[in-house]
Amino acid sequence: MKTSLLRMIAAGALLAAAGSLLHADEAHPPATATTRVLPITHLWADAQGVSHFRDEKLSFEAATPENPTAGTTSRTNPDPEALVSLPLRGATGATFLYLKRAAVEDWHRAPRRMYLIAVQGMSEVTAGDGQVRRFGLGSIVLMDDLTGKGHITRAVGDVDPIALTIPVPAAPH
């Protein structure tokens, strides 16, 4: 029973993330055949330990001799770039994160560098520099504020927020 529930939640997470791209706002337009990018938010800490938000994009580029670590392409479609799989290199230990409705997590750092994908509800995050952003269904955040005082997380709205977290290796220095 527990395994089937987790599978159902995982499938829902993938569908939610994919579906949200169809309804993305203008600041984060969906990936298209023209843009081939996926917008994400990067929450990071500067040398003084103050966290900040930065908008970034994951590029769906096929591997080439010059860039052998890029994504893999379709082997069955006549157009090999009709499907490009972008691996999250080194990602193991994915978990679901639950936050009770109206809960507030005071100043804290990300426990490790990880992608966080919202699959239900909405959270409001305050960075160390005071900027506040809301993340709802399908939002992707690279949690990378591992030093300093971190950030505040609040559950907002009428639905308990749930997110899928995917740990990734530390950024190269």
Task: Label each residue range with its predicted role.
Residues M1-I9:
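Bacterial N-terminal signal peptides that target proteins for export
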Residues I9-S20:
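Bacterial N-terminal signal peptides
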Residues R89-T92, Q131-S139, D145-P172:
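Ligand-binding loop in jelly-roll beta-barrel domains
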Residues L58-F60, R75-P80, G93-A110, D145-G148, ...:
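Conserved short histidine dyad/triad with adjacent acidic residue
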Residues A24-G90:
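A short, N-terminal "cap"/entry segment at the start of jelly-roll beta-barrel domains
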Residues Y98-R101, R109-V125:
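Short, conserved beta-strand element in jelly-roll/cupin
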